[in-house]
Amino acid sequence: MDSQQDNKKWIAVYTKPRHEKTVENELLKKGFEVYLPILKERRKWSDRKKWVEFPLFRSYIFVKTEIKNSLFVLQTMGVVNVIKFGSEIAVIQND
């Protein structure tokens, strides 16, 4: 396995409200691996019904990156912060 791939960890990123798709697209352009879990729900209005997609976790997106590159993630348009426990970036386990 590639040693560079071994250093990559999943981190959670907090976005501006309703900017999850924008952040996903911007991070993909920068070459990051991104995961944005989406739910589909049928919504009903007075005149129509429609399937609507929305994020499972509002204002959160997951990025696989080396911890040292988290600054590049933070500099992405729409990103508010990288989730941390204390002063350390929170790493999401693969299990």
Positions of PLM-derived features:
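Acidic-enriched and Gly/Ser
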Residues: 1-95
